[in-house]
Amino acid sequence: MVGEFLKREREALGLTQRDIAERTNLMRQLVDELEREDFHRVAAVIYGRGFIKLYGEALGLAPEKIALLQQDFSTIYNGLSQSPIKIKKEEKPL
């Protein structure tokens, strides 16, 4: 998921959460919450997408990868982490 990916990339670069906080001007606690996918501080999906963008840029990720992470974030934030279920229309009796 989004948080796990960001954490793995950060650790692979030898960076701490504090390093990311300093590079993005986000609170370190928010960086931790993003990595744990604890989005209770995120007031709206647009803010979360912005946080993901800042974090991705701090890691040097390609814009395309950041866009994919933002999409994944939106899905999680909106509670749609599973594929939508298709409901069949009831057939009317003859």
Describe the function of each predicted region.
Residues 1-8, 12, 16-19, 29, ...:
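Low-complexity alpha-helical segments at protein termini and membrane interfaces
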Residues 10-11, 44-48:
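Short acidic alpha-helix initiation/capping motifs at coil-to-helix transition points
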Residues 28-45:
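Recognition helix of helix-turn-helix/homeodomain-like DNA-binding domains
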Residues 39, 47, 60-64:
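Residues in soluble alpha-helical coiled-coils and helical-bundle/repeat scaffolds
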Residues 51, 55-56:
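Hydrophobic micro-packing sites on short alpha-helices
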